[in-house]
Amino acid sequence: MEAERGPERRPAERSSPGQTPEEGAQALAEFAALHGPALRASGVPERYWGRLLHKLEHEVFDAGEVFGIMQVEEVEEEEDEAAREVRKQQPNPGNELCYKVIVTRESGLQAAHPNSIFLIDHAWTCRVEHARQQLQQVPGLLHRMANLMGIEFHGELPSTEAVALVLEEMWKFNQTYQLAHGTAEEKMPVWYIMDEFGSRIQHADVPSFATAPFFYMPQQVAYTLLWPLRDLDTGEEVTRDFAYGETDPLIRKCMLLPWAPTDMLDLSSCTPEPPAEHYQAILEENKEKLPLDINPVVHPHGHIFKVYTDVQQVASSLTHPRFTLTQSEADADILFNFSHFKDYRKLSQERPGVLLNQFPCENLLTVKDCLASIARRAGGPEGPPWLPRTFNLRTELPQFVSYFQQRERWGEDNHWICKPWNLARSLDTHVTKSLHSIIRHRESTPKVVSKYIESPVLFLREDVGKVKFDIRYIVLLRSVRPLRLFVYDVFWLRFSNRAFALNDLDDYEKHFTVMNYDPDVVLKQVHCEEFIPEFEKQYPEFPWTDVQAEIFRAFTELFQVACAKPPPLGLCDYPSSRAMYAVDLMLKWDNGPDGRRVMQPQILEVNFNPDCERACRYHPTFFNDVFSTLFLDQPGGCHVTCLV
């Protein structure tokens, strides 16, 4: 074994030249005002803040004065020379070297010393969807990452194979942060790999150091901060907890699986519906206050409703003579808002007659982890046939790991899709067959993982071949008790831009259908009246009326279970509530009870306040139809079908 010094940039400067004590105190106060909340949230002791500011201002990387990297070659005791030679000749023998970071300074390291905080640089920062492209295009990046990860190449290895190896191994090295401000896109999680020094720090359940990502605003640069949790003597190892913050032993075991492989096959993968306390906690977390019981308000025949809305598509398209727009929220009979109501109690007390476009507790439908939970009422712990098998990574990680390993053992398809609980437009959504990747994605935003549809029903596009497509229906919920549910007769289609295959999992235009938010991507437009005859031509044994009947059966079952229990376990029966949702679904090939191939609808998500731009453009009466059905109880002639 050998030890080498850690990275060195420049000597640590001991003072800020030309700065008076008063100026130094002022600079520290400004630094604390700007960065204090982030530092406190990360647990960085205040005794380090002064020296941290100095190191940030002057880019002082002085870890090399205190630490060294020890390289340990682990040799199998039982292995003879011949076997060792054979292993060395293999194309990629893997990481035979183990690295440790140790304290090399003779005087050791004192946790109480204000200088005992260190900056770690980041070698690579990216968003997951750009990783492959950067490895292929950024000069030197692939070589540096391969070296850092211990990927050795004997002979000429194709770069595509090298890239694939790095993309798999990087989940042992990736760390994540996200910005607190900006657009939805700007707040997407960023993944980074620390430099060679930071990446050599190993795990310990009782670590000697803590680390935290830190974004230094004046320079717009991200670092990782490293500080000791106790005093260390020379020769002691620097370690951190790779599962920091998690105390449950089983979940820790799962989180550490990328570094410490473990067999979870004996654990049940069963995921029953969560208990009532789970839903009560969600209600409290959402700060939603349930309404009091009220009597429905009856308006005189011919009453003209004043509508207050901040939804531009409603304001531009609603022309029905029974509705008039008002700029005064206080005068409105109907509130059709884009943002979520929270205080239904106050509304029910002060303005019980005001109609609104949402139901208390409708997040049970529109948030993906809740959707999966309530769906189990229809299909048991495995879920119903119309919803892909889904696990909440925050609460059901062990069950998911067990299920993944079971499928792996039986040679079954193991492609999965990670989705945030509550984002649309495929933001921060990833298709993968890497268990390590899924486990690590849990550390960014709250996510579910759903079985990726490996055998979707495809649509032949003459220009590109057979592609994935999804279907969007608009459903109108008139009331919870009794359940009254309608579906708009026109549906909308979205298509992938490249022929489908279970490869290139980060190829957005192959695996995703949401193209209408990227100005650089072509949106394939096919209207439903054109789609149906073309679909039946491609699949003559599957009449669209039969396929749609199965889709409507799935919608009916979903809303029945969503409304079956009182709040917060189900949607609240508030007489003044109405709602419009978009249900996105795909079709997959499955086997029916008789063994014949069937098209099984797969509900992907339910969206509150969907984008209705295409609906308004191609069907000018759309919002007149919606308002007549929901608020006038006059669905006749409104292009809707009653489901319940």
UniProtKB/Swiss-Prot annotation:
GO terms for cellular component: centrosome; cytoplasm; cytosol; midbody; nucleus; plasma membrane; spindle. Keywords: ATP-binding, Cytoplasm, Cytoskeleton, Immunity, Innate immunity, Nucleotide-binding, Nucleus. Changing residue 244 to A: Decreases expression of IFNB1 mRNA following infection with Sendai virus. Pfam families: TTL. Expressed in the basal layer of prostate and endothelial cells. Increased expression in prostatic intraepithelial neoplasia and metastatic lesions. One of its GO terms (molecular function) is ATP binding. The keyword ATP-binding applies. Residues 1-25 are annotated as: Disordered. Its main location: cytoplasm. GO terms for biological process: innate immune response; negative regulation of type I interferon-mediated signaling pathway; protein modification process; regulation of mitotic cell cycle. ATP binds at residues 450-453, 468, 470. Residues 1-13 have a biased composition (Basic and acidic residues). Residues 300-644 form the TTL domain. It is found in: Cytoplasm; Midbody; Cytoplasm, Cytoskeleton, Microtubule organizing center, Centrosome; Cytoplasm, Cytoskeleton, Spindle. Interacts with MAVS; the interaction prevents MAVS binding to TBK1 and IKBKE. Interacts (via N-terminus) with TBK1 (via protein kinase domain). Interacts (via TTL domain) with IKBKE (via protein kinase domain). Interacts with tubulin alpha. Interacts with histone H3 and histone H4 (when trimethylated at 'Lys-20' (H4K20me3)). Interacts with CBX3. Negatively regulates post-translational modifications of tubulin, including detyrosination of the C-terminus and polyglutamylation of glutamate residues. Also, indirectly promotes histone H4 trimethylation at 'Lys-20' (H4K20me3). Probably by controlling tubulin and/or histone H4 post-translational modifications, plays a role in mitosis and in maintaining chromosome number stability. During RNA virus-mediated infection, acts as a negative regulator of the RIG-I pathway by preventing MAVS binding to TBK1 and IKBKE. Belongs to the tubulin--tyrosine ligase family. This is Tubulin--tyrosine ligase-like protein 12. It comes from Homo sapiens (Human). The gene is TTLL12.
